[in-house]
Amino acid sequence: MSEDPNAQGNSRRWIVRAVEDSLRRLGTDHIDLYQVHRPDANTDLDDTLSALSDLVHQGKVRYLGSSTFPAETIVEAQWTAERRGHERFRVEQPPYSLFVRGIEASVLPTCERYGLGVIPWSPLNGGFLTGRYRPGEAPPATGRAARMPQRFDPERPGVARKLDLIP
């Protein structure tokens, strides 16, 4: 939501700025669920959780979540929150569809173990499961297929096999 290419990451500075900007744009005094999208290798998880906890204690955020976190990072976040007295993640938002099921082996059991809800994203696999992409037909020149042509190229053998499964 920013023109600043450096306005990213999970540091206190950017999280607080993002929440304040969202509250202003939404014209509200709190966010029900604030999710951290993807781990940030440049920011210590304790720093991220500390910033998020402060926002919860200030009443600006009600609940915290993670998105696209691997199981081991979810565990680390839960342990860090418990050890340091931070608010913990309550939900995880992983990619999940008939074709993307990797979370079943580790992320889902981890969420169950730690009592996290799961809010899957991309259940239609980025439009792939809609029947929009067909062998012998070029994908649309705009949108997701244009940004990630290797993923949606119906002539690639792996993609074509998947498309054959879609009615």
Regions found by a protein language model. Name each.
Residues 1-2, 30, 141-145:
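Short, basic/glycine-rich phosphate-binding loops at helix/coil junctions
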Residues 1-16, 37-43:
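Active-site mouth loops of central-metabolism enzymes
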Residues 9-26, 74-79:
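Short, acidic/polar
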Residues 20, 36-39, 69, 97:
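Flexible loop residues that form catalytic
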Residues 23-42:
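Active-site groove signature of glycoside hydrolases
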Residues 43-167:
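Beta/alpha (TIM)-barrel catalytic core signal, keyed to glycine-rich beta->alpha loops juxtaposed to Asp/Glu
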